[in-house]
Amino acid sequence: MQVTETVNESLKREYKIVIPAADIAERSARRLEELKGQMRLPGFRPGKVPMSMLRQRFGKSVLGEVLEKAVQESIREVMTSHELKPATQPDIDLISEVEEGKDVEFTLALEVLPEIGETDFSALALEREVAEVAAEKIEEALETLRQQSKTHEPVTDGRAAAGGDLVVIDFIGKLDGEAFEGGSAEAYDLELGSNSFIPGFEDQLIGATAGEARTVTVSFPEDYPAAHLAGKETVFDVTVKEVKQAVVPELDDDLAKAFGKESAEALREAVKADLQGELDEVSKTKLKRKLLDALADGHDFPVPQTLVDAEFEGIWAQIEKAKTDGQLDEEDAAKSDEDLRADYRKIAERRVRLGLLLADVGQRAQVTVAQEDLNKALMRELRRFPGQEAAVINYYRNNQQAMDNLRAPVFEDKVCAHILALATVTDKPVSVEDLMKDPDEDATPTA
């Protein structure tokens, strides 16, 4: 086999490979000999079929089989001898038609992965924005839990219904004097002020007492899903059967136990921990973004354009869909396709460069994704699809690509955590408002 390097530019490599005709002939002869021993043809004893007949019958198919194997072996040999790490599947092109008795010539073209030097991450300095959950937010969350746990009891003094009360009603809706389908119910629980009914309906029941009949006139919204009712004025005959007042439990140990905690103080601490955890996640996300920005700014090695092309095509498909759906943001909508393509190609190149860098760092640091890590990621996915847990598990179990997609962000997070452990990270106390602010927003002066 003869190998000639014809291109060596940046990450591009191309080789002209020649497999001598004698090598192909020898391989073909060996393969035909194997077939001869296996062949059973009428009129010939086993293993005695003439070679000329074998060549006539199977010569072309054997040549194709031998060529495919010889080409693959030669590619592997070139990859090994030249220590090539292909970024994507190589391109293989025959230089001339394959003919028996002639050398086989073809080109092997590929892009290789870049050599990425080791980085001293101890020289990296980053600020981590941190914020503490405010006491009033804890109280608001506890109040929400109290309201979620409220019950309703019949009023005992015969008073009229007020906002926040629950009325038990029978009603019949009429359009142009005729009852319409879906417009009636009996013993329906309606909380006044919940805005769960047509606008204006609940307001007209405030002041009603148990046993009272009222006529409620409302107009359905113009965008109401049922087209025959949208924008139409409708009359409801309503009978108030019962008025119930809300009973909100105290923040005590009994309420805490309803939420799986032993005491009111334990519930308070759990709520505080949950709220603080949400802020800490925002802090973590913003720190990771700063880290990735710093890594992108600090590394400028060449990247395989085949990978950039693939990444860009994925991004551009999303842009095209956003255009079709009318969901392209104002800034992008104002740009020409040429400018948009240029902008998003830069983003694609950045993503590829960061992906290669993190993969290299992870390999050097022997970062691995354990089954426990994958299980946690899968549990997060399950929480996104309540009631469909079995289907989600089945999907990942039978879809390797989906499992790889689940693994990738876990690996990325672990590599980022490794880098941050080596870097100098300083906590910067900020307000909750500043922590929640998008870093791309213009900074606003603070007093």
UniProtKB/Swiss-Prot annotation:
Domain text: Consists of 3 domains; the N-terminus binds the ribosome, the middle domain has PPIase activity, while the C-terminus has intrinsic chaperone activity on its own.
Main enzyme class: isomerase
Protein name: Trigger factor
Species of origin: Rhodospirillum rubrum (strain ATCC 11170 / ATH 1.1.1 / DSM 467 / LMG 4362 / NCIMB 8255 / S1)
An example Gene Ontology molecular-function term: peptidyl-prolyl cis-trans isomerase activity
Pfam families named in the record: FKBP_C, Trigger_C, Trigger_N
One GO biological process term: protein transport
PANTHER family for this protein: TRIGGER FACTOR CHAPERONE AND PEPTIDYL-PROLYL CIS/TRANS ISOMERASE (PTHR30560), TRIGGER FACTOR-LIKE PROTEIN TIG, CHLOROPLASTIC (PTHR30560:SF3)
InterPro entries cross-referenced by the UniProt entry: PPIase_dom_sf (IPR046357), PPIase_FKBP_dom (IPR001179), Trig_fac (IPR005215), Trigger_fac_C (IPR008880), Trigger_fac_C_sf (IPR037041), Trigger_fac_ribosome-bd_bac (IPR008881), Trigger_fac_ribosome-bd_sf (IPR036611), Trigger_fact/SurA_dom_sf (IPR027304)
Documented EC number(s): 5.2.1.8
Transmembrane segments: none
Alphabetized UniProt keyword annotations: Cell cycle, Cell division, Chaperone, Cytoplasm, Isomerase, Rotamase
Family: Belongs to the FKBP-type PPIase family. Tig subfamily.
Compartments, record wording: Cytoplasm
GO CC annotation: cytoplasm
Purpose of the protein: Involved in protein export. Acts as a chaperone by maintaining the newly synthesized protein in an open conformation. Functions as a peptidyl-prolyl cis-trans isomerase.
Chief location: cytoplasm
The reaction(s) this protein catalyses: [protein]-peptidylproline (omega=180) = [protein]-peptidylproline (omega=0)
Superkingdom per UniProt: Bacteria
Domain PPIase FKBP-type, first and last residues per copy: 164-249
